[in-house]
A protein has these predicted regions:
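C-terminal catalytic "cap/lid" subdomain
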Residues: 1-235
Length: 235
C-alpha cells in the first residue's frame, strides 16, 4: 500500500488561475479549489504558494525601481491567495491566508507556529507575499516555507509534465527525466527552480520534490497518491 505524505507544500503558478488573457478563470479556480479541499479531506496537511504571473511579472517593470516591482509582485500573490481561499471555502473546505507582508485587516500575519497549527487543524494554508523580501522569487519562497513547515514533499505544478533535458516546446528531441538529484539538476542547468531555491533545497534536505503538469487540476490528487510520476527530485 502506498504511503501518502503527511505534510505537503504545493506551488501553483498565477497563470494557472487565468486563461485567454483574463486575470482569473472562475471555472478553473473553483476546480482547483475543490481539489485542494479534497486533498485536505484525506488527512494530508497542505500549504500552498501561488505566483502572481497572471497579475504582474518582473519583465513588465522595464525601468521601474526593482524593489517597487518586486513589492507589486508580492501584492499580486496576496490577491491570488485570497481568491483561492474563497474558492476552497466555496467548495466545502477550510482555508487561511498568511502573509509575509503585514496586512492584518486582510489576512493573517505570517508566523511559523500559527501556520503549522492551521495545517494540523486541516485547513488549506496559503502563504502570500513571497518571502517578504524583494529580489527573492516564489521558488525560493516555497522552499523556505517547506523547510519551516517541515514538509515531507514539495510539489511544483508546471505547464509541462515534468523536467526535460531541454525545453520540450522548442526541442522535439527533449526527453522527460523521471528521477534526478538536486545537485545534478543544478549542475545540468535544468530550469526547474532558481539557484537560490536549489541551494536551500540542498541545505535543508527537503526529502522530495515532484514536478508535474497541471493540464488537469486532478493531477494534484494523482501525484500525491503516487499515481502520476512526473519528475522526482531528491537530495
Amino acid at each position: 500500500m502506498k504511503e501518502s505524505p503527511k505534510r505537503i507544500l504545493l506551488k501553483l503558478s498565477g497563470e494557472a488561475l487565468g486563461e485567454n488573457g483574463r486575470l482569473f478563470d472562475q471555472d478553473m479556480i473553483l476546480r482547483v479549489g475543490k481539489i485542494l479541499s479534497d486533498v485536505a479531506a484525506t488527512g494530508a496537511q497542505l500549504g500552498v504558494v501561488i505566483g502572481a504571473g497572471n497579475i504582474w511579472r518582473g519583465r513588465q517593470s522595464q525601468e521601474m525601481d526593482a524593489v517597487t516591482a518586486d513589492h507589486m509582485g508580492m501584492l499580486g500573490t496576496v490577491i491570488n491567495c485570497l481568491c483561492m481561499r474563497d474558492a476552497v471555502e466555496r467548495t466545502g473546505g477550510h482555508a487561511v491566508v498568511f502573509s509575509a507582508i503585514d496586512m492584518p485587516r486582510v489576512c493573517e500575519p505570517y508566523n511559523v507556529q500559527s501556520a503549522r497549527q492551521a495545517m494540523a487543524e486541516g485547513k488549506v494554508v496559503f502563504f502570500a507575499g513571497g518571502s517578504g523580501n524583494p529580489f527573492f522569487t516564489t521558488d525560493t519562497a516555497v522552499v523556505l516555507r517547506a523547510a519551516e513547515m517541515q514538509a515531507d514533499m514539495l510539489l511544483l505544478a508546471k505547464n509541462v509534465d515534468g523536467v526535460y533535458t531541454a525545453d520540450p516546446n522548442k526541442d522535439p528531441n527533449a526527453q522527460l527525466i523521471h528521477d534526478i538529484s538536486y545537485a545534478e539538476a543544478l549542475e545540468r542547468c535544468l530550469r526547474v527552480m532558481d539557484t537560490a531555491a536549489f541551494a536551500m533545497l540542498t541545505e535543508q534536505a527537503i526529502p522530495m520534490v515532484r514536478v508535474f503538469g497541471l493540464a488537469e487540476p486532478e493531477n494534484i490528487l494523482k501525484v500525491i497518491a503516487g499515481d502520476l510520476r512526473g519528475t522526482v527530485l531528491h537530495p
